[in-house]
């Protein structure tokens, strides 16, 4: 894609190449970045790991390059009840936690009902 050829970019739960985003965005264009907060799937992580690590929900903001700025941010939070074993298996399959945790811990999650908190941060970042 050509420099400054995009009015909108989106990064959803994925690593972001900030320099490439800046290169692609047209002046006044925006980047929608969606990522987990420290609360996201906390209940699942407690079942999978001996120690659940905290992290800073705003750490990525320090990576915003010159020529771009955070224009708006919101967090969406809700509880999700997973009573069905297939739903719990699907959740594990779509998160990195399902790959990192032991087979024993994954099986224990699949075998028992689980309520999880979904917590997603939405950032709107604009190109100057």
Which residues does each PLM region occupy?
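Short His-Asn-centered micro-motif
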Residues: 10-14, 33-34
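A short acidic, Gly/Pro-enriched loop at the edge of an enzyme's catalytic core
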Residues: 1-8
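Short, catalytically relevant binding-site loops at active-site mouths
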Residues: 15-18, 37-41
């Amino acid at each position: 894609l050509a420099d400054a050829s995009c009015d909108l970019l989106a990064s959803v739960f994925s690593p972001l190449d900030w320099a490439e985003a800046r290169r692609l965005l047209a002046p006044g264009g925006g980047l929608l970045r969606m990522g987990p907060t420290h609360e996201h799937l906390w209940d699942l992580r407690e079942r999978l790991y001996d120690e659940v690590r905290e992290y800073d929900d705003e750490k990525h903001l320090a990576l915003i390059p010159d020529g771009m700025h955070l224009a708006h941010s919101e967090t969406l939070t809700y509880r999700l009840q997973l009573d069905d074993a297939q739903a719990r298996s699907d959740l594990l399959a779509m998160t990195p936690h399902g790959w990192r945790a032991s087979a024993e811990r994954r099986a224990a999650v699949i075998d028992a009902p689980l309520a999880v908190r979904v917590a997603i941060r939405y950032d709107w970042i604009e190109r100057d």
